[in-house]
């Protein structure tokens, strides 16, 4: 790529509206797949949706999937390439992206702070094979702030405030855990560290849609500005059968009475499930790290 020209983009519609960036790659692959250069999820993109190549002050757009159009030029069929003058708006899936170039000489005169990144990736992580998953931002360059007062001087990268990121991630993780608990997803646990929210656990095929809705809630709450590492998988292990509880004692040492026998917290049942805790109207059982709620 010509060092005097950089390719910039701005999302002008969709979930990531107003997101801006600068890519240092001469050719960038855009899609929802993990191996794309710029990855957007929840926007109806194919894993490899389209490819852009900067050619001076024009942009070559190659359609790799259906559902792509250039404003003013109409739809582009899969496999077709179109060269358009910059700036240009590309419509893909549920989003629209404005692409433009800016000379390096003029970029230093802009006083408004602008995010400059070599690759912006919303990296899809986790193996939940249904719906659309959450995203994680991965910046391969430090953010650079332009300042009109620094004329002729080298710009230094502005390092992120890790403490602020950690506090934001911790607050978001706490809210996400509450939402997960409200959805009855007892096998999902949330943690936060170094500005990243991590999700681990399992869901059944029946409860997968509930987890999908929680992810959508998180995405819209954070507007894609917070990293979410998704480690949730589908596990359809057979749930324990109903418990024929004869009596329940919920005092300082709670226990169940089943077939005349007392089962305290930590006791093993016949099918290998362990009594995790006793709650009002239900017993939480655990086996191999999985929790199951059984009413009584």
UniProtKB/Swiss-Prot annotation:
GO terms for cellular component: plasma membrane. The chain crosses the membrane at residues 82-102, 117-137. It is a multi-pass membrane protein. Its main location: membrane. Keywords: Cell membrane, Membrane, Plasmid, Transmembrane, Transmembrane helix. The keyword Aminoacyl-tRNA synthetase does not apply. The keyword Phosphoprotein does not apply. It is found in: Cell membrane. This is Uncharacterized protein y4yQ.
């Amino acid at each position: 790529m010509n060092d005097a020209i950089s390719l910039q983009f701005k999302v002008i519609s969709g979930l990531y509206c107003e997101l801006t960036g600068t890519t240092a790659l001469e050719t960038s692959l855009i899609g929802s797949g993990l191996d794309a250069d710029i990855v957007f999820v929840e926007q109806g993109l194919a894993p490899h949706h389209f490819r852009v190549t900067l050619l001076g002050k024009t942009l070559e757009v190659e359609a790799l999937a259906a559902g792509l159009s250039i404003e003013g030029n109409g739809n582009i069929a899969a496999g077709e390439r179109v060269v358009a003058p910059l700036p240009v708006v590309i419509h893909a899936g549920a989003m629209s992206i404005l692409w433009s170039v800016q000379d390096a000489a003029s970029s230093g005169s802009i006083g408004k702070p602008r995010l400059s990144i070599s690759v912006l990736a919303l990296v899809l992580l986790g193996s939940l094979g249904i719906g659309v998953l959450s995203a994680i931002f991965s910046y391969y360059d430090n953010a650079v702030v332009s300042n009109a007062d620094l004329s002729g001087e080298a710009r230094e990268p502005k390092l992120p405030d890790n403490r602020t990121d950690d506090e934001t991630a911790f607050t978001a993780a706490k809210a996400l855990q509450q939402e997960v608990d409200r959805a009855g997803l007892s096998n999902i646990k949330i943690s936060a560290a170094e500005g990243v929210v991590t999700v681990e656990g399992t869901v059944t095929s029946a409860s997968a849609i509930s987890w999908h809705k929680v992810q959508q809630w998180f995405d819209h709450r954070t507007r894609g500005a917070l990293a979410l590492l998704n480690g949730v998988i589908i596990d359809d292990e057979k749930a324990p059968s109903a418990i024929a509880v004869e009596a329940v004692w919920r005092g300082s040492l709670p226990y169940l009475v089943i077939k005349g026998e007392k089962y305290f917290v930590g006791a093993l049942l016949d099918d290998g499930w362990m009594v995790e805790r006793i709650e009002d109207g239900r017993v939480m059982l655990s086996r191999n790290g999985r929790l199951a709620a059984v009413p009584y």
